[in-house]
A protein has these predicted regions:
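A boundary/linker detector
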Residues: 34-58
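HINT/intein-family self-processing domains that catalyze protein splicing or autoproteolytic maturation
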Residues: 1-34
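Short Cys/His-centered divalent metal-binding micro-motifs
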Residues: 115-148
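Histidine-centered nuclease catalytic patch
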Residues: 80-122
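Short Cys/His-rich Zn2+-coordinating modules
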Residues: 52-64, 105-111
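Histidine-centered active-site/metal-ligand motif
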Residues: 28-33, 91-92, 131
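Short cysteine-rich loop/turn motifs with clustered Cys
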Residues: 57-89
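C-terminal, well-folded lobe of enzymatic/effector domains
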Residues: 135-181
Length: 181
């Protein structure tokens, strides 16, 4: 890093909420919400509301987006030795279960809950096998494709854990701002 003063410009990169800048590949977040340290507690919405929200996430738009660059027959990046056999499934990077435990989530309108749950940057495409194996586990918890006893790619898990750690404060900030906190 540099000790000198640097002029900073405020701009928005269309279609990308996070991107890398400069030779040092500094990750920059480009959004209308201020990231805040995530605050988790117990889930404060009913099972019925959870199920209703679950039926509306991922949205159709998100499911289409994770398949934009899908190549059937390509190597599965999560499970060594497996191939992508069809459409990718949209998987929450920070799980829906975890999001619903973020402080103030319960105070949001249904529309804003779905806005948070369908936040496009919080999705990745997983093969059907990988998504079924991962379930609601975090990437740090998901270590094995049990059906065939294949370890999940450590490189892939590490990349996704970094994304998860970046997204958690973004989601908390988004929830706080939508809740007027």
């Amino acid at each position: 890093m540099h000790d000198e003063t640097v002029k900073v410009y405020n701009f928005k990169v269309e279609d990308y909420h996070t991107y890398f800048v400069g030779d040092s590949s500094l990750l920059v977040h480009n959004a209308e919400y201020s990231p805040t340290k995530p605050r988790y507690g117990e889930r404060r919405i009913s099972d019925e509301e959870y199920d209703e929200l679950r039926s509306q996430t991922p949205s159709r738009k998100v499911r289409q987006k994770v398949n934009e660059n899908n190549i059937i027959g390509a190597d599965d990046p999560a499970i060594h030795g497996k191939k992508i056999e069809g459409s990718l499934e949209a998987d929450h990077i920070v799980s829906m279960d975890k999001i619903t435990k973020i402080e103030n989530f319960d105070k949001l309108s249904t529309e804003n809950k779905l806005k948070v749950l369908n936040y496009e940057d919080n999705f990745t495409g997983l093969s059907k096998s990988a998504n079924a194996s991962k379930g609601a586990k975090s990437y740090s918890e998901w270590a094995l494709y049990k059906k065939e006893n294949i370890p999940i790619s450590q490189e892939y898990r590490t990349k996704m854990m970094v994304k998860e750690s970046i997204l958690e404060p973004i989601l908390q900030g988004m929830i706080d701002e939508l809740a007027g906190k």
